[in-house]
């Protein structure tokens, strides 16, 4: 149930208006143009609601759902409640995301102003139509682009450059960074701090001063409590269209290619390079100074200790080709059964 405390329902919406809005929908030739009041999961939908199916695990619920309509994959041919209108989409999950925007808007709004409790240096440049929240600190020579939002308690260090349409949530810290347009940084993220660099001499760990920065491209999202260290000599670089989940650690000098996705609790050690459109599952570990090729994927909890060729899929720790990992898992189960049966004898 969507809470009206936080989101405003913009419905009802006519079914034909929904189809027109989503553009790439294939609908039955004749449908009743009913009013749709809300979006619900298949199990909870009523005759006034629309639902969606993107994961085939939930296709059984389509037989019993009460939804008036349901967005399904383009090639879906399974059974469904005959009273539910099936709307076939090229990408049903993408269509669902657009539908959320069509039906809901956040109640929380941001006035175009700098709150009185914010501290903004005289030499800072704040663009047009920006919101600077309570207790934000913006230091000297910072540049913030038009239409940006900096929420309460965030710190923007000297010389940082943030592009247009940024949304920086509460208690974010940004230092030594240049950030592009349309970037979202969720609460508690820390960007541009010293990396983990020490030189050991005669039993003493001496800190290496980091003189690189962090460069973040356009249309990037960085999750809550994620940390991105600045480079020691070479910059840490996050290219356009990347999506980085919560609680990710990105070490100094790491380079992440365009469109890559990094899931929660992943750690990437210093000076490793992640190619374009890579996918790293949850709790993946990447050792330092490695190269992960374009389009490579690492399954959850994979431990990567050597380079991965472009397009390869690996899993396990140490990470190996995914099919080998599956075979190993099967063999281990068989060995365990054999050893258990011998122990019983």
Swiss-Prot record:
InterPro entries linked: Hexapep (IPR001451), Hexapep_transf_CS (IPR018357), LpxD (IPR007691), Trimer_LpxA-like_sf (IPR011004), UDP_GlcNAc_AcTrfase_non-rep (IPR020573)
Pfam families associated with the record:
Hexapep (PF00132), LpxD (PF04613)
What chemistry does it catalyse, as a reaction equation? a UDP-3-O-[(3R)-3-hydroxyacyl]-alpha-D-glucosamine + a (3R)-hydroxyacyl-[ACP] = a UDP-2-N,3-O-bis[(3R)-3-hydroxyacyl]-alpha-D-glucosamine + holo-[ACP] + H(+)
Top enzyme category: transferase
User: SUPFAM superfamilies given for it?
Assistant: Trimeric LpxA-like enzymes
Q: Which GO terms describe its cellular component?
A: membrane
Q: In the record, what terms sit under GO molecular function?
A: N-acyltransferase activity
PROSITE patterns referenced in this protein's UniProt entry, alphabetically? HEXAPEP_TRANSFERASES (PS00101)
Q: Which GO terms describe its biological process?
A: lipid A biosynthetic process
Keywords, comma-separated and alphabetical: Acyltransferase, Lipid A biosynthesis, Lipid biosynthesis, Lipid metabolism, Repeat, Transferase
Pathways involved: Bacterial outer membrane biogenesis; LPS lipid A biosynthesis
The EC number(s) given in the record are 2.3.1.191
Domain of life the protein comes from: Bacteria
Active-site residues? 252
Protein purpose: Catalyzes the N-acylation of UDP-3-O-acylglucosamine using 3-hydroxyacyl-ACP as the acyl donor. Is involved in the biosynthesis of lipid A, a phosphorylated glycolipid that anchors the lipopolysaccharide to the outer membrane of the cell.
Family to which this protein belongs: Belongs to the transferase hexapeptide repeat family. LpxD subfamily.
Assembly and oligomerization: Homotrimer.
Q: What is this protein called?
A: UDP-3-O-acylglucosamine N-acyltransferase
Q: Which gene encodes it?
A: lpxD
């Amino acid at each position: 149930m969507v809470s009206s405390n936080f989101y405003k329902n913009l419905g009802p919406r006519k079914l034909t208006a929904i189809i027109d809005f989503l553009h790439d929908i294939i609908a039955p030739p004749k449908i009743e143009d009913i009013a749709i009041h809300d979006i619900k999961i298949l199990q909870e939908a009523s005759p006034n609601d629309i639902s969606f199916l993107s994961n085939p695990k939930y296709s059984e619920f389509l037989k019993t759902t009460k939804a008036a309509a349901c967005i399904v994959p383009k090639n879906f041919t399974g059974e469904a409640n005959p009273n539910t209108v099936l709307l076939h989409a090229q990408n049903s999950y993408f269509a669902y995301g657009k539908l959320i925007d069509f039906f809901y808007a956040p109640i929380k709004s941001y006035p175009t102003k700098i709150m009185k409790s914010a501290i903004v240096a005289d030499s800072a440049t704040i663009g047009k139509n920006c919101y600077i929240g309570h207790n934000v600190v913006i230091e000297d020579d910072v540049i913030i682009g038009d239409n940006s939002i900096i929420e309460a308690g965030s710190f923007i260090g000297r010389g940082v450059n943030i592009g247009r349409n940024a949304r920086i949530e509460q208690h974010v810290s940004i230092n030594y960074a240049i950030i592009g347009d349309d970037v979202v940084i969720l609460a508690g993220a820390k960007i541009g701090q010293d990396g983990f660099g020490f030189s050991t001499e005669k039993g003493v760990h001496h800190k290496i001063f980091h003189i690189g920065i962090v460069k973040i491209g356009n249309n990037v999202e960085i999750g809550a409590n994620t940390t991105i260290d600045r480079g020691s000599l070479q910059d840490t670089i996050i290219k356009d269209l990347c999506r980085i989940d919560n609680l990710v650690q990105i070490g100094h000098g790491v380079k992440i290619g365009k469109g890559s996705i990094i899931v929660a609790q992943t750690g990437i050690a210093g000076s490793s390079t992640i190619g374009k459109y890579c996918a790293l599952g949850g709790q993946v570990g990447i050792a330092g100074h490695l190269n992960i090729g374009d389009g490579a994927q690492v399954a959850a909890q994979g431990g990567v200790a050597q380079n991965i060729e472009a397009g390869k899929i690996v899993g396990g720790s140490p990470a190996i080709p995914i099919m080998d990992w599956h075979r190993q898992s099967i063999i281990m189960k068989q060995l365990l059964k054999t050893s258990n049966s011998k122990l019983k004898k």
